[in-house]
Amino acid sequence: MHPQVLIAGAGPTGLTLALDLARRDIPVRIIDQATEFFPGSRGDGIQPRTLEVFEDLGVLDAVLTAGSPTPVMRAYFGGEFAGQRRMADPVEPTPAIPYPNLWVLGQSRTEAILRDRRPHCPAAASSSSQRR
């Protein structure tokens, strides 16, 4: 199967696009300038709408298992404890908004989950991933 789409960038956006196209039987090829996968993180927050996309792609369970809700933060003023709270108050899901809260998961782990899903999508699995 020859790729019909070339995706520049093997980060979360490129991998998400590859999975979405592959499930539509559109073969892709992903290229990336990096020579290896970045082990750190450039972004840890996954937005609610992205969680909906991940559900649609079949990776949501892995993302929810690997990540966590936003952590509690503590504030200190003049060396004294002033209080603690979450970055945002949790919101209850509704049928219209099933995932209303930010989810915390490092980018390298998100990328690994998306890469692990590629073998389940023949059009993505048959494409080549070139890293230079």
List each language-model region with its residue ranges.
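N-proximal short alpha-helices
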Residues: R23-P27, E36, G83-M87, V91
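A conserved short coil-to-beta-strand element within the FAD-binding core of flavoproteins
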Residues: S128-R132
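A short helix-to-beta-strand connector/capping loop
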Residues: R118-S126
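Active-site-adjacent segment of FAD-dependent monooxygenases/related oxidoreductases
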Residues: R42-P119
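N-terminal Rossmann-like FAD-binding beta1-loop-alpha1 element of flavoenzymes
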Residues: H2-I30, T35
